[in-house]
Swiss-Prot record:
UniProt KW keywords: ATP synthesis, Cell inner membrane, Cell membrane, CF(0), Hydrogen ion transport, Ion transport, Membrane, Transmembrane, Transmembrane helix, Transport
Subunit structure: F-type ATPases have 2 components, F(1) - the catalytic core - and F(0) - the membrane proton channel. F(1) has five subunits: alpha(3), beta(3), gamma(1), delta(1), epsilon(1). F(0) has three main subunits: a(1), b(2) and c(10-14). The alpha and beta chains form an alternating ring which encloses part of the gamma chain. F(1) is attached to F(0) by a central stalk formed by the gamma and epsilon chains, while a peripheral stalk is formed by the delta and b chains.
Entry's localization field: Cell inner membrane
Chain ranges passing through the membrane: 1-21
UniProt source species: Granulibacter bethesdensis (strain ATCC BAA-1260 / CGDNIH1)
Gene Ontology terms, MF aspect: proton-transporting ATP synthase activity, rotational mechanism; proton-transporting ATPase activity, rotational mechanism
UniProt similarity note: Belongs to the ATPase B chain family.
GO CC annotations, alphabetized: plasma membrane; proton-transporting ATP synthase complex
Protein name: ATP synthase subunit b 1
Membrane topology note: Single-pass membrane protein
Superkingdom of origin: Bacteria
InterPro entries hit by this protein: ATP_synth_b/b'su_bac/chlpt, ATP_synthase_B_chain
Main function: F(1)F(0) ATP synthase produces ATP from ADP in the presence of a proton or sodium gradient. F-type ATPases consist of two structural domains, F(1) containing the extramembraneous catalytic core and F(0) containing the membrane proton channel, linked together by a central stalk and a peripheral stalk. During catalysis, ATP synthesis in the catalytic domain of F(1) is coupled via a rotary mechanism of the central stalk subunits to proton translocation.
Length: 194
């Protein structure tokens, strides 16, 4: 520190002496740019030394710290970006897996629905066929019973018609007709109606 003060005082002595000289000529123009004045020269030298000191201070101490902060920040940002890309890739994979699961579930559900529908159709067709066969049997049985009843009724009708015809002829004519003749006439009449 002391050395700096001594250098400062010694370098300003010529400028002070020049400024104190009453016979020094006055220059026209800007006094800051009057290099004939030793004070201006010393100011320029000191300004250069101060700028050099600032440059050295900034380049050796401040700029490396700023550079370190910038590098750390860039590394942090790149790490965050990598984490974000990884998270996005994981999310995309999860979404794709979920979409695949939904597609598989839809296909399985559709297959199950088709299986259930076809089983229901087959069961309904089987039940319809069984009902149809049962109804056909019942219809055939009913037709057989009807035919049997008709035959029985027709057989009874022949006897009743024969007896009734004999009774009517006997009442109308007062004579009993022959059994064979009445049965033959009743048979012809019934045959004509059937």
């Amino acid at each position: 520190m002391l050395l700096g003060t001594v250098v400062t005082v010694l370098s300003t002595l010529p400028a002070i002496a020049y400024a104190m000289d009453p016979e020094s000529p006055e220059h026209e123009g800007m006094p800051q740019l009057n290099f004939a004045n030793p004070l201006t020269t010393s100011q320029v030298v000191w300004m250069a030394l101060i700028l050099l000191a600032f440059y050295l201070l900034l380049s050796k101490w401040a700029l490396p710290q700023v550079s370190q902060v910038v590098d750390d920040r860039n590394a942090s940002i790149m790490g965050d970006l990598d984490s974000a890309h990884l998270a996005k890739a994981e999310a995309n994979a999860a979404v794709e897996e979920m979409n695949d699961a939904i597609r598989r579930a839809n296909l399985e559900g559709q297959a199950e629905i088709e299986k259930t529908v076809s089983a229901a159709k087959a069961k309904a067709q089987q039940e319809a066929a069984e009902a149809h066969a049962r109804l056909e049997r019942q219809l055939a049985d009913a037709e057989a019973r009807i035919a049997s009843s008709r035959d029985t009724a027709m057989g009874a009708l022949r006897d009743v018609a024969t007896d009734t015809t004999q009774a009517l002829i006997a009442r109308l004519t007062g004579q009993f007709p022959a059994q064979d003749t009445v049965e033959q006439a009743v048979g012809q009449a019934l045959a004509a109606r059937s």
